[in-house]
Amino acid sequence: MKYVALAFVLSLVILQISAQVGAAYIPGMGSIGSVGRAGAAAGASAGIGNQGRGAGLLRFFTLILENLMKNNQQAQPKQDNFGAQLQNLLKKKMILEMIN
């Protein structure tokens, strides 16, 4: 029982750190930490036995995958926009080099 509690607390700490790092570096990724905490709490409250932990882990990973897919769909236009901006900057640089 104490190992379950220890694993639960450690998972919350790791998820909090990953949420802060994700929010700092990747737009939209900070919400994964909150989703992960909800999944871990659901797993812990579902039961002490293996079934409860298994259901909680399954829900936890399902929520993370759903969130990653949602963030990936939202991020694709940003990546295309970044490529267009990069090409635009390279064109401007080439024009400036020609002038000089």
UniProtKB/Swiss-Prot annotation:
Superkingdom to which the source organism belongs: Eukaryota
Q: Where is the signal peptide?
A: 1-23
Keywords linked to the UniProt accession:
Secreted, Signal
Q: Name one GO cellular component term.
A: extracellular region
Q: In which tissues is it expressed?
A: Nacreous layer of shell (at protein level). Expressed primarily in the mantle with highest level in the mantle pallium and lower level in the mantle edge.
Record's subcellular location: Secreted
What name is this protein filed under? Answer: Uncharacterized shell protein 7
Natural source organism = Margaritifera margaritifera
Show the taxonomic lineage.
Eukaryota, Metazoa, Spiralia, Lophotrochozoa, Mollusca
